[in-house]
Curated annotation (Swiss-Prot):
Protein name in UniProt: Small ribosomal subunit protein uS19
Gene Ontology MF terms in the entry: rRNA binding; structural constituent of ribosome
Biological function: Protein S19 forms a complex with S13 that binds strongly to the 16S ribosomal RNA.
Similarity-based family: Belongs to the universal ribosomal protein uS19 family.
Keyword terms, alphabetized: Ribonucleoprotein, Ribosomal protein, RNA-binding, rRNA-binding
Gene name linked to the record: rpsS
Species: Cupriavidus taiwanensis (strain DSM 17343 / BCRC 17206 / CCUG 44338 / CIP 107171 / LMG 19424 / R1) (Ralstonia taiwanensis (strain LMG 19424))
């Protein structure tokens, strides 16, 4: 179930403060955050946000197409190593 339209998009307050500082100072350094649940807002366009995936911070450059999505969608948490080889096929 999606979030109610009357509530509006959710974004953590500490992340909004960091974005305001970055846009006012024209700072190109990535904004480090653990908030994967925050929605990408139009103010984030053009910024690089380092989103934590449980192990490291993955840099995500925000474009216009990403607005409305969550930050966690762009930082993959699971690594796929491939399926085990079939032992019968090797013989």
């Amino acid at each position: 179930m999606t979030r109610s339209a009357k509530k509006g998009p959710f974004c953590d307050a500490h992340l909004l403060k960091k974005v305001e500082v970055a846009t006012s100072g024209k700072d190109k350094k990535p904004i480090k955050t653990w908030s994967r649940r925050s929605t990408i807002l139009p103010e984030f366009i053009g910024l690089t946000i380092a989103v934590h995936n449980g192990r490291q911070h993955v840099p995500v450059y925000v474009t216009e197409n990403m607005v409305g999505h969550k930050l966690g969608e762009f930082a993959i948490t699971r690594t796929f190593k491939g399926h085990a080889a079939d032992k019968k096929a090797k013989r």
